[in-house]
C-alpha cells in the first residue's frame, strides 16, 4: 500500500471503532441501570468518552451533543433514584404510562414472532444469540444497539487484518434500514410524550440522530 491508502485505511478503522463505542455507550445509557454506568454518567466520564468518539466518527453531531445532549446526561441523583426513574420511564406504567423500548411494540405488532425470528436470523448470521440466563427479547433497543456495536467493531477488525469489510458494512446498512432507522423515531415520539427524565429523552434523541447519520454514511461507503 502507498501512504495515502494506508492513511485512508487507518481513518476507516478509527471511524468504525468510534462508531462502535458510541453504540456501546448508547446501550449502556438506555439499558437497565447498574452502579458502574450510574457512576460514569455522574462524574462525566461517559459523556467525555461519547464526545470523543463522536468527534472521530461524526464531527457534525459532536457539536450538537456538546450543546444539546451532554448537559442533560449529567446525573446528580443517587443510584437508587436513577433506577426508579428508569423503571418509571420504561417498565412499570406507574404512576404514569411508560414508554416501550421494544421494536415489536412500535412496528409489526401483529407479527411480533416474525420480527423476533428475523432478528434472531441477523444475530445468528454472525454467531450471536441472546443470553439464555437473561430475560431480554431480541427486539429490545439495547440488544439492537449492541448488535451494531458488534458489527462496527468487526468492520474495524477486518480492516486491521487486511480483509474485506463489505459483509459487515452491508449488514450495518441492512440492519439500520430494516430496524433502527424505522422504529427509533417512534420511540422518540413516545419518549417525548411520556418520559419526564431528560437523561432518557436526550439519549433517545442522540440515538435517532446517530443511526440516521450512520445509515447515510454506510450508503455512501458502499456506493463509493
Curated annotation (Swiss-Prot):
UniProt main location, coarse: cytoplasm
Gene Ontology CC annotations of this record: cytoplasm
Entry keyword Chaperone: yes
Cross-referenced InterPro entries: DMSO/NO3_reduct_chaperone, DMSO_Rdtase_II_chaperone, TorD-like_sf, TorD/DmsD_chaperones
Keyword annotations: Chaperone, Cytoplasm
Coiled coil: none
Top-level taxonomic group: Bacteria
Purpose of the protein: May function as a system-specific molybdenum chaperone protein essential for the assembly of the perchlorate reductase PcrAB complex prior to its periplasmic translocation via the Tat pathway.
Family in the record: Belongs to the type II DMSO reductase enzyme chaperone family.
Protein name according to UniProt: Perchlorate reductase assembly chaperone protein
Gene: pcrD
Amino acid at each position: 500500500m502507498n501512504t495515502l491508502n494506508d492513511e485512508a485505511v487507518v481513518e476507516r478503522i478509527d471511524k468504525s471503532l468510534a462508531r462502535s463505542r458510541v453504540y456501546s455507550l448508547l446501550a449502556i445509557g438506555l439499558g437497565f441501570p447498574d452502579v458502574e454506568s450510574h457512576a460514569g454518567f455522574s462524574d462525566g466520564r461517559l459523556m467525555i468518552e461519547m464526545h470523543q468518539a463522536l468527534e472521530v466518527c461524526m464531527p457534525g453531531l459532536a457539536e450538537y451533543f456538546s450543546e444539546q445532549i451532554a448537559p442533560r446526561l449529567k446525573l446528580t441523583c443517587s443510584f437508587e433514584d436513577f433506577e426508579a426513574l428508569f423503571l418509571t420511564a420504561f417498565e412499570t406504567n406507574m404512576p404514569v404510562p411508560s414508554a416501550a423500548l421494544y421494536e415489536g411494540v412500535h412496528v409489526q405488532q401483529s407479527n411480533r414472532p416474525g420480527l423476533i425470528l428475523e432478528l434472531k436470523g441477523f444475530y445468528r448470521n454472525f454467531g450471536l444469540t441472546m443470553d439464555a440466563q437473561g430475560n431480554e427479547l431480541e427486539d429490545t433497543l439495547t440488544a439492537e444497539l449492541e448488535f451494531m456495536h458488534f458489527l462496527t467493531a468487526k468492520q474495524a477488525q477486518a480492516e486491521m487484518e487486511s480483509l474485506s469489510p463489505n459483509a459487515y458494512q452491508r449488514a450495518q446498512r441492512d440492519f439500520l434500514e430494516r430496524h433502527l432507522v424505522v422504529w427509533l423515531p417512534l420511540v422518540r415520539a413516545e419518549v417525548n410524550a411520556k418520559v419526564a427524565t431528560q437523561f432518557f429523552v436526550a439519549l433517545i434523541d442522540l440515538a435517532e440522530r446517530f443511526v440516521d447519520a450512520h445509515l447515510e454514511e454506510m450508503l455512501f461507503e458502499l456506493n463509493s
